[in-house]
Amino acid sequence: MIRASKVHGQYHWKEPAADTVVLDFDDRHRRRMAMTGTRGLSFLLDLEHATALRGGDALVLDDGRLIEVVAAPEPLLEIRGRDPQHLVRLAWHLGNRHLPTQIMAKALRIRRDHVIADMVRGLGGKAVEIEAPFDPEGGAYAPAHEGAAHHDHGGHEHRHHDHGHHDHADHEHDHKHDHGKHDHAGHDHAHDHHVHDEHCGHDHGHGHSHKHDHK
């Protein structure tokens, strides 16, 4: 089977594509995977490291032909605030839960999650269910690949994470903050941690409860 072992960055290519692959967020985070294009061309994605592909990238086959990557629509939540300051506050809460987030001009997009939707609405924001391609921000320290702001994951493979479901059983993080006269008793800082499935390339074992007593 012919291989695709290189990636041309987002729209940094001019040649016509021999075929197209339509991939969701999970399948755009692969190192090695057999694929078939929409026109029937089968090939093996065989990259040196797991790479975050984006819509508009091109996979380079061994014979020089290109396969265009198209981001598939998937179930998302579009989050809006009352004003820019409120939207930034909502973004902080999403970041506190380590959720992949796509930043729009006046909105945020995350993978659909009913727990997070309820949280956003409880904070006064809007959370609307949509179907759209998902192109979240990459890591702040991620190197680029060939003209685009893509990252690879060094010597270890980060497969996709399922952020659609949150397991509240095994990840009990009871963060109790005692800051002098500041009483945080009414605030439950529960972190909705994502489930790491079989595609995660590293062990995230959290078998203990984290309690932080800041005096």
UniProtKB/Swiss-Prot annotation:
Secreted as UniProt keyword: no
Pfam families: UreE_C, UreE_N
GO biological process, one term: protein folding
CDD domains tied to this protein: UreE
GO CC terms, sorted: cytoplasm
Cross-referenced SMART domains: UreE_N (SM00988)
Positions of the UniProt region annotated as Disordered: 134-215
Function, as annotated: Involved in urease metallocenter assembly. Binds nickel. Probably functions as a nickel donor during metallocenter assembly.
Family: Belongs to the UreE family.
UniProt-listed HAMAP family: UreE
Protein name as annotated: Urease accessory protein UreE
Organism of origin: Rhodopseudomonas palustris (strain HaA2)
Lineage: Bacteria, Pseudomonadati, Pseudomonadota, Alphaproteobacteria, Hyphomicrobiales
Gene (UniProt): ureE
